[in-house]
Amino acid sequence: MERLKKVGDVKARNSSEIKSSPIGLGFEKLDRGLFDPEKAYDKVAKLGVKWIRIQSGWARTEKVPGVYEWEWLDSIIDNLIRRSLKPWVCLCYGNALYTPAAGEVFGAVGCPPIATETERNAWHRYVAALTRRYAGRVELFEVWNEPDGVWCWKHGPDGGEYGEFVKATAAAIREGNPAAKVVAGAVCMRDLGYLNDMLATGAGKAMDYLSYHGYWPDELEKADRVRAYRALCARYNPAIRVIQGETGVQSRSDGAGALREGAWTPRKQAKFLARHIIADLFEEVSFASYFSCMDMIEALN
């Protein structure tokens, strides 16, 4: 086989020059203040990507019962929109005001507010207030992050339990903004049984999109997996579309992340990005998001 020969360069275009694109990037972990987004906004806009995934940070927003401090999230969303980027919001995580266990975990990661009526009602109020506030600015809202992993559902993943959470959260999303779209899943474990249990609760009828996280070294694995997701969703709601919500590696061998054991370099990272984004688009996902805009210093979700 002859090796490919470079014949030229693709000129980069700013996001403001692009009306729409199926390529996105992650701004995850700002709910825990783990990096300064001011250093990233302009650089990301120059990439020409469109969709930017952010996490809503309930614990950072509601520190006093019933009082929402939106300023930090306002700044992020407004800065993205000002640069012609499209934020979509992952609704997470828990809040120690209502779930005591959430106070023992950094960022309340993995502590869903589902055990008591007080927790459920507080979550409903928060979600409805958030979607109402960002109506006209944010279209897509995702229900939690990687609920099929024990790190994000600490008392033990349960597809049926998550399905009920999806239905309740979808109702809150649409109470705040009837035009909003609901993204559910954010699945990472390739367990179709879990996904079926979730959909069997009736959650599929409340969803517009299924999101998945494709941390697979070989991008060729994606085709069968995405087709399986589509086929399963079609049993419950043929209108569900698919989003690739996270995939990616760091640029160095001592980093953190799902595929941290690779001997990564910036060149290898770039090759991984190109292969995986192309594979996602080949499967006609609605859009594909790369994790993330920077190398993370730790592996918290």
Would you name each region that the model predicts?
Residues 2-129, 135, 142, 148:
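N-terminal substrate-binding region of glycoside hydrolase catalytic domains
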Residues 4-31, 226-269:
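Mobile, glycine- and charge-enriched loop segments
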Residues 20-24, 50-53, 86-88, 139-142, ...:
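Structural preference for beta-strand elements that scaffold enzyme active sites
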Residues 29-31, 58, 93-95, 147-149, ...:
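Active-site-proximal loop/turn and secondary-structure-junction residues that shape catalytic pockets
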Residues 34-38, 64, 70, 74, ...:
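Active-site cleft segment of glycoside hydrolase catalytic domains centered on the general acid/base Glu
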Residues 47, 84, 134, 138, ...:
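A structural signal for short coil/turn segments at secondary-structure junctions
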Residues 81, 174, 281:
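Anion (oxyanion) recognition and catalysis
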Residues 248-301:
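Aromatic/acidic polysaccharide-binding cleft in carbohydrate-active enzymes
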